[in-house]
Regions:
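Protein-protein interaction and targeting regions used for scaffolding, dimerization, and localization
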Residues: 1-222
Length: 222
C-alpha cells in the first residue's frame, strides 16, 4: 500500500486540467504557456484554500479568526506574486516538462476513482503523518506528534508544488534564486498559522482539526 496526499479539485480546475490535456495530446497549434500559467495559479489557490482557509472556521475566537485570516491572505499574496514572476511566455517545448510533472506526478485517482490533485508521500513522511493523526483521539491528544504531522504535511506540499514544480521551469539565475526565499516566506507564514492556532484549541477542537485534514490522506494499492 502507498500513502498519498491530495485534494479533490473544483469543477473549474477539473475543466482546466481536461482542456490542457486535450490541447497537448492533440498537438494543437496554439501557445501552451497561458494554459500552464492559469492551471498552476488555480492549483495554488485551491491548495491554499484546502490547507489553510478551512482552518479559520476551526478557531473559536472571532478576533483570532481575523488574525488567522490576515496570515492566510499574506500567504496567498506571496504565492501569487511568486508565480507571476516565474511563469512567463515560454516556448511550447519548454512548457511540456511542467505539464508532464502536473499530469504524472501531481494527480492521481483515489479509491473511488475520483481525480485528486496531490502526490505520493515518502514512507518517512507518511509514517510521521499517520502517527500524528493517530495521536489525536477523543480521549487523548499528543500535541507534539500532531504538530509534527501538520508541519510535515505543509513541508512536503511546499516541496512538491514549489521546489519540484519550479525545477521544470526554464528560468534564469535571478528568478531561480528567488524561489528558496519565497518558499521560506510561505513556510514561515504556515508555521506562524499553526503556532497561533494549536495552543488556542481544546482537545475537542484539535479533534475537529484532525478530522478536517484526515480526508486529504489516501491509502491505496500501488
Amino acid at each position: 500500500m502507498a500513502q498519498y496526499f491530495g485534494f479533490i479539485p473544483s469543477d473549474k480546475l477539473n475543466d482546466m486540467i481536461n482542456e490542457a490535456e486535450r490541447i497537448i495530446n492533440s498537438n494543437e497549434q496554439v501557445d501552451y504557456y497561458p494554459y500552464r500559467n492559469e492551471l498552476t495559479q488555480q492549483i495554488a489557490r485551491e491548495l491554499i484554500d484546502n490547507l489553510l482557509v478551512g482552518l479559520i472556521d476551526v478557531i473559536p475566537n472571532p478576533e483570532r479568526q481575523a488574525a488567522m485570516g490576515k496570515i492566510v491572505n499574506t500567504i496567498e499574496r506571496t504565492t501569487e506574486t511568486l508565480l507571476n514572476v516565474l511563469l512567463g511566455k515560454d516556448k511550447n517545448e519548454d512548457i511540456i516538462p511542467s505539464f508532464e510533472f502536473l499530469k504524472n506526478e501531481s494527480m492521481f485517482l483515489d479509491n473511488d476513482g475520483e481525480r485528486r490533485v496531490g502526490f505520493k508521500l515518502s514512507d518517512r513522511a507518511a509514517q510521521t503523518i499517520n502517527e500524528g493523526y493517530a495521536a489525536v483521539t477523543p480521549d487523548n491528544v499528543d500535541l507534539v506528534k500532531f504538530k509534527a504531522a501538520l508541519e510535515t504535511m505543509n513541508e512536503v506540499a511546499l516541496t512538491h508544488f514549489i521546489t519540484r514544480f519550479t525545477e521544470t521551469l526554464k528560468l534564469g539565475m535571478i528568478k531561480r534564486g528567488s524561489i528558496p526565499v519565497a518558499k521560506a516566506g510561505i513556510d514561515k507564514g504556515m508555521s506562524l498559522a499553526l503556532n497561533k492556532l494549536l495552543p488556542q484549541l481544546p482537545d475537542a477542537g484539535l479533534n475537529r482539526l484532525a478530522g478536517f485534514y484526515r480526508p486529504f490522506f489516501i491509502e491505496k494499492a500501488e
